[in-house]
Each structure stands twice: as C-alpha cells, then as structure tokens.
C-alpha cells in the first residue's frame, strides 16, 4: 500500500552528428552557393565533453571562400564549471568586382583568425535558475586588402590589426512557469 514501482528504460544515442548544408547565401562575385560540413560529438571522451568542427566554402569558387571553426567544451564537475576553447579562420577573395566597369573596379580580400578560451563557473545551475560567471580571454587577427581603380587610377589600402581581449560576464536566467 502506498508503494510505486517505476521502470526506466534508456536507449543509447549516437554521439556523432554530421550535417551537410547547401544554401544560396553567397554573392555573384564569390558564387551564389555555399556548402558547409559540420561534425559534432557531444561525448567524445565519455565524460560529456563536446567537440565541434565546421567548414564552409563556395563549390565553384573554392579559392575565393574558405572558412572553418573548431570548438571544444570540457565539463569540470569537481569545480562546478566548464572550460571551452574555440578557434576560427576565414579567407575571402573578391577579384574583378566591377560595379561600374571602367569607372570603378575593385579587388577585395580578407583573412581572419579568432582564438578564445573561457572558464564558466556555475554559481546556480538548476532546471529553473541559472547563474553563470564567465571569464574569457581571446585573440583576434584581421587583415583586409582593398584595391580600387577609379577611372583607371589605382588606389590600394590595407587594414591590419591584432587585439587581445579579456572579459568577465555574469548571466542570469530564470525559467518562467
């Protein structure tokens, strides 16, 4: 009397996920089509860590569009937090862009590198309330080259910078019922 018997059944799920995407988010100069391949494993070492890798390009303009990213997250239950690392790279070339042929001709290119390291401390982490303190450090390296020809007169410009970022962030989320 007053007793319950509960049977729980769990199915093993595949931790590997692949996705191939095709979209029309490009331009006429770098190809209208973008293709992406993404891989995510949400339990790579058997300890609920996550690895994600993604690459994007333009099939007809592979030499013009190359981007990629990798991310890894490691739960640290003994510390009540997690550590994450992200890296991304991008390279785009737009040659012979002629919005007004003979009057304005352009060649544009850019490269970017981003690296990030974050530690998140879970101050409160329940199904209803999440309070998280995030400490991060990042590095950015960007380079853009602009080549213009205005009525046959060449004008070249380069924008090149590197920056180190540091951040502290507090986030609070509360689920409403």
What are these model-predicted stretches?
Residues 1-84, 125:
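Outer-membrane beta-barrel initiation region
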Residues 17, 82-177:
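Transmembrane beta-strand segments of outer-membrane beta-barrel domains in Gram-negative
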């Amino acid at each position: 009397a007053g007793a319950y018997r509960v049977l729980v059944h769990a199915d093993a799920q595949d931790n590997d996920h692949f996705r191939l995407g095709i979209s029309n988010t490009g331009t006429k100069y770098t190809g209208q089509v973008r293709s992406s391949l993404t891989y995510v494993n949400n339990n790579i070492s058997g300890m609920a860590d996550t690895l994600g890798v993604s690459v994007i390009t333009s099939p007809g303009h592979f030499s013009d569009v190359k981007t990629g990213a990798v991310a890894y997250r490691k739960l640290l239950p003994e510390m009540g937090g997690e550590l994450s690392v992200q890296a991304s790279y991008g390279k785009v070339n737009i040659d012979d862009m002629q919005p007004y042929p003979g009057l304005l001709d352009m060649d544009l290119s850019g490269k970017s590198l981003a690296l990030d390291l974050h530690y998140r401390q879970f101050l409160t982490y329940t199904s209803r309330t999440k309070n998280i303190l995030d400490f991060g450090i990042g590095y950015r390296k960007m380079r853009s080259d602009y080549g213009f020809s205005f009525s046959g007169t060449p004008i070249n410009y380069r924008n090149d910078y590197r920056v180190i970022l540091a951040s502290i962030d507090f986030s609070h989320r509360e689920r409403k019922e």
